[in-house]
Amino acid sequence: MSLWFLVFLSVLQGVTELFPVSSLGHTLLVPALFGMHIDKHAPQLLPFLVALHLGTALALLWYFRARWIALIGGFFAQLGGRKNDDGHLMWALIIGTIPTGIVGLLLEKRIERVFHDLRIVAIALIVNGVLLWLGDRIQRSRAHQAPEKMTFKQAFFVGLAQIGALIPGFSRSGLTMIAGNVAGLTAEKAAEFSFLLGTPIIFAAGVLELPKLFHARDQLADALLGGVLTAIAAYLSVRFLMRYFEGRGRLASFGVYCVIAGVFCLGWFMLHPQPV
């Protein structure tokens, strides 16, 4: 893997993992648009992807470090019988993580095999954009009805939405923000819950494959560089997005991008079919 391609993939992962535009979809579509071939069976690819996931997770942990300390403290306080908002939210995150954790372990590889056609990925990106636009409309219609505290039912509903992100073209952060909007959360609260909810999922995706990273010692330098670049890109992305949604930023903007990008990619790959 050339240095510039390594940098390109690392930054692409760090940005698109958190922006509601589908990191997996972009990782498949963008290189193909530029004629770059990614060998999924290359021995150096898996360790590299592991490092990228860990870099993203560490960036999220660092950005929300004070929040996580409060959540963990509240969780143990609640176990001791002292009810508190942080402990409640921690339980909500645990409940929201369960659906994707189970389905991901059972079906992720099968889903990836079915949706490796880039035209299908482009269609999924278009649908993702439409859903973002609809989610934005719903959130704005309920702007003054947001609950003070997320219920466990809402958390489970948002967690179910994460399952859709196993399909390339659908965004994990996008789907969970949409679900949060449908559940009645403000844009800012939906974004925060989405990023907090995604942290254990992204971290687990890296940790489960961590032994393979250490077995590929000759690839550690590339993997380490990729992880660091991804962490920087992810940190800057989450910082921007939280400020964006605090300032009444709209999901619809990302929805428009996804539809335009998806339509362009669909047309391109219809005219230039890729080997399946």
From Swiss-Prot:
Acyltransferase recorded as keyword: no
InterPro entries: UppP
A Pfam match: BacA
Keyword annotations: Antibiotic resistance, Cell inner membrane, Cell membrane, Cell shape, Cell wall biogenesis/degradation, Hydrolase, Membrane, Peptidoglycan synthesis, Transmembrane, Transmembrane helix
UniProt catalytic activity: di-trans,octa-cis-undecaprenyl diphosphate + H2O = di-trans,octa-cis-undecaprenyl phosphate + phosphate + H(+)
E.C. code: 3.6.1.27
Compartment list: Cell inner membrane
Enzyme class: hydrolase
Gene Ontology biological process: cell wall organization; peptidoglycan biosynthetic process; regulation of cell shape; response to antibiotic
Superkingdom of origin organism: Bacteria
Span of the signal peptide: none
Bilayer disposition of the protein: Multi-pass membrane protein
One Gene Ontology molecular-function label: undecaprenyl-diphosphatase activity
Family, per entry: Belongs to the UppP family.
Protein name from the UniProt record: Undecaprenyl-diphosphatase 2
